[in-house]
Amino acid sequence: MRVIQTALMLCVASTQLCNAAGLERRNIDTDFLFADGMVVDLGVGSVSPSFTATQGGGFAFESGKNVAPSFSITTGSFKSEISDKLDLGIWHTTSGNGVNIDYGSVTGPGMTGAMNSSMTAVTNSGRIKADVSLPSTLLAAKYQMNDNWSLIGGMKYVSVSGGQLMLPMDIDGRDPATGAINPNGDLLIDTTSVWNFGSTQGTGAVLGFAYERPDIALRVSIINEAKIDLSVPTTSGGGVAANSNSEASIGDATTLAFQTGIAENTLLFGSVRRSNWANNQITIQTLGGPATITDFVDGKNYTLGIGRKFSDKLSGSLSYYYSDGDGDGASELSPYGDTKTVSLGAKYSINDNTDVSFGLSESERGDATTGNFAAKLTGSSVTSFGVKLTHRY
């Protein structure tokens, strides 16, 4: 059953392109360490969201604009069998975490004039935009302790290299009706501030273990990823400090995954993942001091699917993914509630050493109202497609 197990999981992996919690896009994958011999693979994916924001809380958004542009992800891995007990490998993705949001012009109440009681209320326009991508690299080893148990360990490396954030800012917090200091702290649009991010990186440990019974294609694994802190050099303008550091974290996460044969040439698989984002918000510097611009919640997601080997050359999979979430007060950078995804995967063996895998996912995102500008988003969806080439030496 080991050959069947490996073949099916190749097509399953090709469907896992976009995740839901915090800034997650493509979580690290340790399954490649379980392949036999020396293996290299390369995959590319396209993610096409459809998010439209409508008016709320006194702010107006561009009608019909898709606020979440499409993006692509490239993922690759290399694994070598050092001995009967030890495997070493490297896994990389161009966008393990990230955000690509552009609400365009946002119109709402603001102030003009000198910063005193003579200021007058006006209608101003600002812009909400964020474009940041965080590549992830995993260096990992698997040590086979006995016929059933193996130990997995390594380091995850996350980097930032450029990116930009644009937000409408309330410079002095004055009431638009009176010009007095606004006691309620209602958000106004006085200007659009811009933060340009520099380069930084961080590392975190990855530890876990797995139990296997190859005769029934059973594998159960638990993997823990440590938190990674990032202090990003930032230059900015438009009513904010000119030079500063922005603070962000990739929260710790634990993934429990399983797969088992349930009939000849048929595999049942699933996972439960818990990621910590509530304590890992993004903080930027303004004239008034540090400001938290996100309202991430902890991620809890579940996957269940079935894989089937149809012939020596063709295998397929079908899976369902669910991630809970509350759309009330959502972050402008991740404006959705829960996530429901159906994925299809297929793998075709070109020859004895080379496979090509395809994946297609259709995701429904729950309705949301963002916390700061009260943007209302309904009927949001994401379509993802990926292809992966695998070669064994």
Residue ranges of predicted features:
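Outer-membrane beta-barrel porins/channels
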Residues: 21-23, 55, 82-393
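Residue-level marker of intrinsically disordered, low-complexity segments enriched
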Residues: 1-2, 10, 143, 187
